[in-house]
Amino acid sequence: MTTMPNWLKQRAFLTPERIAVSDGRRTKTFAELYEAAAVWARRLAQAGVKEGDIVALLMKNRIEMIEIIHALFFLGARVLLQNVRLTSYELGWQLDDSGARLAIADEELAGSLDGDGRVLTVGAVAALPEVDVSLKETCDLEEVATIMYTSGTTGTPKGVLQTYGNHWWSAVGSALNLGLHERDCWLAAVPLFHISGLSIAMRSVIYGMPMRLQTSFDPKEANEWIMRGDVTIMSVVAAMLQRMVAELGEARYPDTFRCMLLGGGPAPRPLLEACKEKGIPVYQTYGMTETASQIATLAPEYSLTKLGSAGKPLFPAELCILKDGKPAAPHEAGEIVVKGPNVTKGYWQRPEATAQAIRGGWFFTGDIGYLDEDGFLYVLDRRSDLIISGGENVYPAEVEAVLLSHPDVEEAGVTGVENETWGQVPYAFVRLKRGASPDEAALRAFCRERLAKYKVPARIYFVDELPRNAAQKLLRRELKRLIPKTEQTF
């Protein structure tokens, strides 16, 4: 067992008057954040939350979300972060699978969990009386702090276990790579329910660094904060960065802005060239929920000479490429395998999936890539067939499962198609049962009832057969060939 002082308690002790978080309207110091989190903890104890419980949060970015996360840490509870874009069915499934004791939701989101007796709105929790409770003063780095569900290539959602140690070493690795400056302030315009957003909140208390919080991404406001020198680091995906560059116009960021951390897949060359011309320091990254954020990062000086690369592994992580169980040669494609204290210990109540993913201390990502002769990582396929749409992961198997649940559908295949706005969008290919009539609008409506909006196929094509290999395995990479040539843009 390796313990250390509770991060927020220790930070409030070390630098109580330093700014912890601001949303442009409200600002809180670490001392104020600590006091607020303690109040939430005493209210949540009144609601019956105790050590070891799993408590779900369905909230958009706001200061109260950060306070409640730390409040649950004070009680020794595990925090299940839920994506606000999911459907009621998807959210309810996560609650049932995790065995969550309680779900806390923003007032406008509580309807997504309507009828579930475990749900309390943030306002309802705020109205609870406080009870005397002993707040945990330490954290065990081996204990699970947070859980985030990821569907994986099987389409079956799995809860990724993120320990305090995972978050700690992710923060340390990032600091050793990016450095830590006295005037640093990290802008969180990405959702806190994603690891990219949550990692900023964790780093804030570990570093003693203020964070700026956007409820939802606003490129104009983000640029204004950067131009004023209020922000020095920002996490984005390519679609966000494109909007910021367009909104920036002929202006240039001040020297106070030192890092644009770009995730969600390699950026298109024109965007990188525009950033280089404007002097925007872009750091491309590779990471996932299972690695508690970035595990490899490309420094800006290599952004064009190593175009498309995700860089090199961060301290103290390791990364290699395996082909047929052996180390691959430079430029030889194979599976990306990673190791380090920021890597998950496994999946919630999924021992078989955990054993398949973690072997000999190495995490097999399922992603395909290669290392060049200088050791720079290039990712070829994200989780084989993973679609990344606007920074959100869309797993074809999950969408296919919904399509196959329709009584008229015999077969279904889903793949990603390039899109200027979102990077990729899902396209579906369906073979109907005999006698059924094709109705794209009705089938998309069926999907909208069961899937988050970004997972709903942008187009559905009706075909006579789907491409399969000799073993009858669906060849998703061949699906785009089924798009009529008059509609192809690739």
From Swiss-Prot:
One of its GO terms (molecular function) is o-succinylbenzoate-CoA ligase activity. This is 2-succinylbenzoate--CoA ligase. Its EC number is 6.2.1.26. InterPro entries: AMP-bd_C, AMP-bd_C_sf, AMP-binding_CS, AMP-dep_synth/lig_dom, ANL_N_sf, ATP-dep_AMP-bd_enzyme, MenE. The lineage of its organism: Bacteria, Bacillati, Bacillota, Bacilli, Bacillales. NCBIfam families: menE, PRK03640.1. Belongs to the ATP-dependent AMP-binding enzyme family. MenE subfamily. Signal peptide: none annotated. HAMAP family: MenE. Converts 2-succinylbenzoate (OSB) to 2-succinylbenzoyl-CoA (OSB-CoA). GO terms for biological process: menaquinone biosynthetic process. Pathway: Quinol/quinone metabolism; 1,4-dihydroxy-2-naphthoate biosynthesis; 1,4-dihydroxy-2-naphthoate from chorismate: step 5/7; Quinol/quinone metabolism; menaquinone biosynthesis. It is an enzyme of class 6 (ligase). It comes from Geobacillus kaustophilus (strain HTA426). The gene is menE. Keywords: ATP-binding, Ligase, Menaquinone biosynthesis, Nucleotide-binding. Pfam families: AMP-binding, AMP-binding_C. It catalyses: 2-succinylbenzoate + ATP + CoA = 2-succinylbenzoyl-CoA + AMP + diphosphate.
